[in-house]
Amino acid sequence: MKNRLNVLLFLLILSTGLYLTRSFWQGWIVGAFSVLITITVVFIGIVIFLENRHPTKTLTWLMVLAVFPVVGFIFYLMFGQNHRKSKTFMKKALSDEEAFEKIEGNRQLNEEQLQKMGGHQQLLFRLAHRLANNPISFSTNTKVLTDGKETFAHIKQALRMATHHIHLEYYIVRDDEIGQEIKEILMQKAKEGIHVRFLYDGVGSWKLSKSYIQDLKQAGVEIVPFAPVKLPFINHTINYRNHRKIIVIDGTVGFVGGLNIGDEYLGKDPYFGFWRDTHLYVRGEAVRTLQLIFLRDWAHETGETILKPSYLSPALTNMKDDGGVQMIASGPDTRWEINKKLFFSMITSAKKSIWITSPYFIPDEDILSALKIAALSGIDVRILVPNRPDKRIVFHASRSYFPELLEAGVKVYEYTRGFLHSKIIIVDNEIASIGTSNMDMRSFHLNFEVNAFLYRTKSVTTLVSDFVYDLEHTNQIRFEQFRNRAWYYRVLESTCRLLSPLL
């Protein structure tokens, strides 16, 4: 109630101030415009207030509207509206339920297998099942791929071996060397009669050439943009982007992780140099869930529902048990902020260690508090971030969180070998998450994401080893040294942090 009163008081002061300043302006046009702006700002402020957002985000938007009323109003229409609880994604939510009915048998949690887990591990996977309805598989093999060279070598080989269908879903696709290689393989497979479907994000891949798309279409590839933006008409859902990176081949082989399709992911960009990223190669039952995630997104964009047995039939269910694997999709089409809640559960259930790798580290208050409490409780909390920016505002906003984390005992490291783009969480060396979700508010609240949650698989052991190896190529940030950094860095970081609820 106190927060709401503060917001209402802010709106009252803002409205009064803007109205009084109108008397100092010259001309009735300017006066009328000021009244219009006042009414608009107050109206939008009331709308934001009634949405019951987090107070920090509410006040940030009000500040933007107050300082930059015209630009702030436009930005709010483009990026500020909350559609999670609206009917914007209703069609997609309905298709989810229809799709899950097709694999009901595989949705049931394997109680016998779950009993082998520890208590807090059981709670995590049950929570994931409740939030996302996705099953856990104990008949899936996974392999960690640690850079672009290894990842694209596996992807190209798997694509060439396809016999029935290829499904791709990517945030960024570039018409460069690796993009051309992937295109040529897809065109060849389509000409062989393989059904190829390609879903790319309309904003992330806005530079993708028309000739690239046309070549694929002429070869028989079905390629569709996700939520395309057609200037000058900007859709109000422009801020909700498909950040997923999924490949499914013949329903039995899948890929998921942090790498998009572009030469920079192979370390060919001179600014970034070596690109440290992580992808997951998947074979077996859990591929069905990746398939389902793709088919739901495809149905949402095209209206074409492809829930056939040839796509959703059991995939290599006789594979040797290699621990539990659970594919989880999250996004604004879900009732809950799934990835955030699962990350929070992982952090709060940790007994020994929490190791996080994230290129964009902008936690909300819940995650930030959980990390500090864990460190203060004696848990080994380590966070690995890049030491060079690709998004400068995000980079400096991220650094503003370091002092309070360091003071609580969290160890923060900056990766120095190249650019770090992996999105990993490892808890107690037993449970891990690998996928597309960053530890930031955009991934929590706005983007469509997908993550693989792993329990006691060989891949968890690999991720632990990779994290230890990556630490050899870092500089550890020390609290005393960092808090004595130049004042202008502190001002810059604090300013960027003010915008963090909007990033």
Swiss-Prot record:
Its EC number is 2.7.8.-. InterPro entries: Cardiolipin_synth_Firmi, Cardiolipin_synthase, CLS_N, PLD-like_dom, PLipase_D/transphosphatidylase. It is an enzyme of class 2 (transferase). It catalyses: 2 a 1,2-diacyl-sn-glycero-3-phospho-(1'-sn-glycerol) = a cardiolipin + glycerol. GO terms for molecular function: cardiolipin synthase activity. Keywords: Cell membrane, Lipid biosynthesis, Lipid metabolism, Membrane, Phospholipid biosynthesis, Phospholipid metabolism, Repeat, Transferase, Transmembrane, Transmembrane helix. PROSITE patterns: PLD (PS50035). It comes from the Bacteria. It is found in: Cell membrane. It is a multi-pass membrane protein. The active site is at 243, 245, 250, 421, 423, 428. The chain crosses the membrane at residues 5-25, 29-49, 59-79. Residues 238-265, 416-443 form the PLD phosphodiesterase domain. GO terms for biological process: cardiolipin biosynthetic process. Its main location: membrane. GO terms for cellular component: plasma membrane. Catalyzes the reversible phosphatidyl group transfer from one phosphatidylglycerol molecule to another to form cardiolipin (CL) (diphosphatidylglycerol) and glycerol. NCBIfam families: bac_cardiolipin. Belongs to the phospholipase D family. Cardiolipin synthase subfamily. This is Cardiolipin synthase. It comes from Halalkalibacterium halodurans (strain ATCC BAA-125 / DSM 18197 / FERM 7344 / JCM 9153 / C-125) (Bacillus halodurans).
